[in-house]
Amino acid sequence: MTGFFSKYSRFGETSEVASDLERLNFRYRHVIERNQNLLAGKTVLDIASHDGRFTFAALRGAGAKFVVGIEARASLVEKVKKTFTEYEVAAATYQFITGDVFEEVAKIERGTIDTALVLGFLYHTARQYELISSLSRIGVMNIIVDSNVIKTDKPYILLKVEGTQNDSQIWDATRPKVLSSIPSALALELLLQEFGYSTTRIEPEGDIPSSAKDYERKARVTIVGIKN
């Protein structure tokens, strides 16, 4: 098996969430490599950075200048630190913040972030509008979204109740279940457009491994929003 994450196989062990290396390699090609122009030499914000897989990919693979990762679960941040030490990532090129995404984004100084990675997050929140508004407010020019979606051609967001106990679920410090939602692809596009981002859907190319067939089924989409 070849691919970016095959060279850094620790990421197949630091999380049980979508950590199949074939899927990670596909997502690297599809999300990171195809948007390298929005990452190379940029300061990047990684929303819900999990075990640091795409923070690392942005730095080591795409050539980002600096990446800030925000992750609510301290146990995952501890794993990131060990992984980055093992792979000798320069400490001056990244920062991980343990905290609530919405609270921490609000603290970021305007104009300090070029590109935001919002990967695997917008179907674990009922606050999509608020997040994109906050990213726009702090001056983020490029937003790369990768999300599960409901399959409809309407701009719908489906509310749901989601557990909070597993790393694959929405985070909440005090409640075992909270309100969450899953958007449609068109809803995501309209949310980005509302704040002045022109949108492009990134369609999957090449061989899609069995562990990433959700992209082929259009149950998951990648959308890039850019402000000119």
Where are the predicted features?
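Class I SAM-dependent methyltransferase SAM/SAH-binding core
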Residues: 65-92
